[in-house]
Curated annotation (Swiss-Prot):
Gene designation per UniProt: ispDF
Pathway: Isoprenoid biosynthesis; isopentenyl diphosphate biosynthesis via DXP pathway; isopentenyl diphosphate from 1-deoxy-D-xylulose 5-phosphate: step 2/6; Isoprenoid biosynthesis; isopentenyl diphosphate biosynthesis via DXP pathway; isopentenyl diphosphate from 1-deoxy-D-xylulose 5-phosphate: step 4/6
Protein name, as recorded: Bifunctional enzyme IspD/IspF
Reaction(s) catalysed by this chain's protein: 2-C-methyl-D-erythritol 4-phosphate + CTP + H(+) = 4-CDP-2-C-methyl-D-erythritol + diphosphate; 4-CDP-2-C-methyl-D-erythritol 2-phosphate = 2-C-methyl-D-erythritol 2,4-cyclic diphosphate + CMP
Biological process, per Gene Ontology: isopentenyl diphosphate biosynthetic process, methylerythritol 4-phosphate pathway; terpenoid biosynthetic process
Organism listed in the record: Ruegeria sp. (strain TM1040)
Residue sites binding 4-CDP-2-C-methyl-D-erythritol 2-phosphate per the record: 233-235, 259-260, 281-283, 357-360, 364, 367
Cofactor(s) this protein requires: a divalent metal cation
């Protein structure tokens, strides 16, 4: 049975505020339309068409990452936009269609599937929520009466139809309609009510964005929180007979200068961990103006960053550190450095890389004036 989804996204959405149609606005790190499209992709709906304003630059930009989508031009009203989409779908031989508001990004697979199941033995089906609030009639700011709510439902989408039936209904329809169920009923189609979902809200007012974000983020609880941090550090050479690199004392004719032990590699890794947590850098936690850190072993800083990550629920997934210098030679000490860093961070050596390169005699490292280090760390919180 050939199924298509028709997402109606040609509206202006002015009541939601923000100076931009709601379907093109950001929501929980993405755009509203992204969440809506993904909801149907997750539900296994392969053919998706979006009806949009072809001249809207925000629509063009938002839909560019989806080359697999079918597109149709919107009309001056919702019903005309739907009609345009249905006519376009007619060319690909659709048997069933789900028509959905782009501004309902929180629709869940269960709601979608229940509509599809109902179409096995009825020409039209749509989700609805039984009205539970008391209903009043009113005039001039005063209550004039109450309304029986026992037979009232709040309509939702997607609204599903046998394709030929709803296409014929729209082709005969003249005028506006609240939704496609109204068009179907005017054409004499029986419409079954399937269970709605309180979270399947339609973004209409500005405050709906915060509610929708809360709903979407609650569904993301099983998605790992993955953080990436970068660290960079430099220390110049000075008097001494060794350098500290990634926790290992490496004999050398010169030392590295710094407020602490100047372990440039460990500092870069530490800053990468802080960066992944948005916790600043070493200087924020261990100010160089504080004399107690003069000459301090850098593993103090690294251990603090590791413990802070664990206190926030993060696991250190992997660390990659590159030392940039002409000398000393790092290769003979690299495994000892990996072992020491893995011990401090409590991680498997297979997830920790320490390597070295030169700058081809360019810059301060090429002139043998000091050592630079770059590090990347990935943290994961389940």
């Amino acid at each position: 049975m050939t199924l298509a989804v028709l997402i109606v996204a040609a509206g202006k959405g002015t009541r939601a505020g923000g100076g931009l149609a709601k379907q093109w606005r950001p929501l929980a790190g993405r755009l509203v339309i992204d969440w809506t499209i993904e909801a149907f992709q997750r539900a296994g709906c392969g053919t998706i068409m979006v009806v949009r304003d072809p001249d809207n630059e925000h629509a063009i930009e938002a839909l560019a990452p989806y080359p697999e989508l079918l597109l149709a031009d919107g009309g001056p009203s919702r019903s005309e936009s739907v009609r345009n989409g249905l006519i376009a779908l007619q060319e690909i031989g659709v048997e069933r269609v789900l028509i959905h508001d782009a501004a309902r990004p929180c629709v869940c697979p269960q709601v979608i599937q229940q509509v599809l199941d109902a179409l096995d033995d009825t020409p039209a089906a749509a989700p609805g929520l039984a009205v539970t609030d008391a209903l009043w009639t009113g005039a001039d700011g005063h209550v004039t009466g109450t309304q029986d709510r026992s037979a009232l439902f709040a309509a939702q989408t997607p609204q599903g139809f046998h394709f030929d039936a709803i296409l014929a209904a729209h082709m005969r329809h003249d005028g506006t309609a609240a939704d496609d169920v109204e068009v179907a009923r005017q054409a004499g189609l029986a419409v079954r009510i399937t269970p709605g979902d309180v979270n399947n809200i339609k973004i209409t007012r500005p405050e709906d964005f915060s509610r929708a974000e809360h709903i979407l983020r609650s569904t993301m609880d099983n998605i790992p929180d993955i953080r990436l941090g970068n660290g960079y550090d430099v220390h110049r050479f000075g008097p001494g007979d060794h350098v500290m690199l990634c926790g290992v004392q490496v004999p050398h004719e010169r030392g590295l200068q710094g407020h602490s032990d100047a372990d440039v590699g460990m500092h870069a890794v530490t800053d990468a961990l802080y960066g992944a947590m948005a916790e600043g850098d070493i200087g924020r936690h261990f100010p160089p103006s504080d004399p107690q850190w003069k000459g301090a072993a850098s593993d103090i800083f690294l251990r603090h960053a590791v413990e802070l990550a664990r206190s926030k629920g993060f696991t250190i997934n992997n660390v990659d550190c590159t030392l940039v210098c002409e000398y000393p030679k790092v290769g003979p000490h690299a495994e000892a450095m990996r072992a020491r860093m893995a011990e401090i961070m409590g991680m498997d050596m297979g997830r920790l890389s320490i390597k070295a390169t030169t700058s081809e005699r360019l810059g301060f490292t090429g002139r043998k004036e000091g050592i630079a280090a770059l590090a990347t760390a990935t943290l994961v919180r389940a």
